[in-house]
């Protein structure tokens, strides 16, 4: 087993290769997901492994519930968690049910991370969509040269942006953009190893030995680091400007009178003069990139720092994350998970966080806003999708099924219909 390829192994084999000999217990399978417990250097760990052969995403309803349960158990017992991720994210053919289940799973992941649960992501070959959000929420990530991590996979980037954005069949270009070596250069918490059982096991053992001395998550430091990355890639923030007058009528009805609204890098923001309420919006109808996500996270951090207990309402009308070379170059997944962590931190510190869906909502942007929210409200005209329709058609080779607004409630992607 020493020289076998880690990423090519079955989920159960990957789990067994990581833990101390004779320590494996509680091995179980939930859908396509494998879970077991064991020790690494005599320290108790729970290990989760996805199945890379699951078509259209390996994180369905069953798998999401199983991971949520393990995170809860691990937090209660103070046992570290290792996620062996090789997945395109939420299972597309389960539609909204998978999206709703992933929303709940990601909420557990955010709360576990903020509570200090040690989490390690071992990246197999493909880690896209929701799986990449799980990975970038973890304390640390380990890649090999065979690893690929991105918010949007190569096929989705090409489907939505054309081959001029990225040729999904150009292995060199894909590796240069989202391969393990490229990703480890982005973050000081990430490591690169050989794609063998021995090297991944060594990385897991080094992590578990050092985990007690690892610094606590500092969202402000993380925000500063991500901002420097944007600047290094030519994405400088713009100064705020007054919001346009022709805001959607439904938004004008909701917002309190006299509020001063501004926009900055695609983010609408303003504060009520009559009550402790902050309002933000991603409502321009365009896919959201790293700079916009970072800007919103910064405004929300300011609420937490300067205005304790202030309620936060976010309005959403956008078709999801930006499937662009430029945004994946800076590792969009890390920006999306950072925003989600900031919002979850606000909720945990007494801020009421509400998401209101005005129009389109899809993919990782929806999850990053909905998972930490106390409530998600859907206004007339809301359209929730697991991915933009063109991306679903590219992956599944068929159109997504039509849905009724009542399906949103049943699936758990919305809490209240207005």
What feature does the model see in each segment?
Residues 38-51, 65-92, 278-281, 295-326:
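A structural preference for short, pocket-lining loop segments at secondary-structure junctions
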Residues 27-32, 57-69, 287-301:
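Glycine-rich anion/phosphate-binding loops
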Residues 70-74, 109, 204-211, 251, ...:
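Hydrophobic, Leu/Ile/Phe/Ala-enriched alpha-helical segments that form helix-helix packing faces
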Residues 1-44, 49-51, 198-288:
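Intrinsically disordered, low-complexity segments enriched in small/flexible residues
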Residues 88-216, 324-418:
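Conserved catalytic cores of soluble enzyme domains
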Residues 53-60, 121, 355:
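Active-site mouth loops of central-metabolism enzymes
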Residues 111-114, 282-308, 341-348:
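A structural preference for long, well-packed, hydrophobic secondary-structure segments
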Residues 55-59, 91-94, 286-290, 322-325:
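A generic structural signal for short coil/turn motifs at secondary-structure boundaries
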């Amino acid at each position: 087993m020493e020289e076998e390829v880690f990423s090519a192994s079955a989920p159960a084999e990957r789990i067994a290769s990581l833990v101390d000999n004779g320590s494996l217990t509680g091995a179980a399978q939930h859908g396509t997901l494998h879970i077991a417990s064991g020790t690494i250097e005599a320290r108790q760990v729970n290990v989760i492994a996805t199945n890379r052969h699951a078509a259209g995403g390996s994180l369905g309803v069953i798998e999401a519930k199983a991971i949520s349960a393990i995170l809860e158990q691990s937090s209660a017992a103070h046992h570290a968690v290792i996620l062996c991720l090789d997945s395109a994210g939420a299972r597309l053919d389960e539609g909204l049910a998978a999206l709703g289940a992933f929303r709940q799973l990601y909420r557990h992941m955010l709360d576990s991370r903020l509570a200090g649960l040690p989490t390690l992501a071992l990246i197999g070959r493909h880690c896209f969509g929701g799986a990449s959000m799980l990975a970038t929420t973890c304390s640390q990530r380990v890649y090999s040269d065979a690893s690929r991590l991105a918010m949007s996979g190569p096929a989705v980037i090409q489907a939505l942006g054309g081959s001029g954005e990225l040729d999904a069949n150009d292995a060199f270009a894909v590796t240069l953009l989202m391969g393990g070596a490229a990703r480890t250069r982005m973050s000081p918490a990430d490591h690169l190893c050989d794609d063998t059982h021995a090297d991944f096991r060594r990385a897991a053992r080094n992590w578990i030995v050092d985990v007690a001395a690892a610094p606590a998550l500092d969202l402000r430091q993380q925000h500063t680091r991500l901002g420097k990355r944007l600047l290094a890639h030519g994405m400088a923030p713009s100064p705020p400007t007054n919001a346009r007058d022709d805001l959607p009528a439904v938004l004008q009805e909701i917002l309190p009178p006299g509020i001063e609204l501004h926009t900055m890098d695609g983010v609408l923001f303003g504060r009520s003069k009559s009550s402790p309420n902050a309002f933000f919006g991603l409502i321009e109808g365009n896919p959201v990139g790293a700079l916009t996500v970072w800007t919103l996270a910064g405004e929300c951090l300011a609420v937490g720092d300067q205005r304790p207990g202030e309620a936060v309402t976010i309005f959403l009308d956008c078709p999801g994350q930006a499937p662009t070379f430029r945004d994946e170059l800076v590792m969009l997944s890390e920006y999306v998970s950072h925003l989600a962590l900031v919002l979850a931190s606000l909720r945990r510190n007494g801020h009421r966080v509400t998401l209101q869906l005005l129009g389109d909502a899809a993919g990782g942007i929806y999850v990053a806003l909905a998972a930490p929210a106390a409530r998600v409200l859907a206004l007339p005209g809301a359209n929730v999708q697991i991915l933009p329709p063109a991306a679903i058609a590219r992956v599944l080779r068929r159109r997504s099924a039509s849905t009724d607004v009542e399906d949103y409630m049943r699936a758990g992607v919305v809490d209240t219909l207005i």
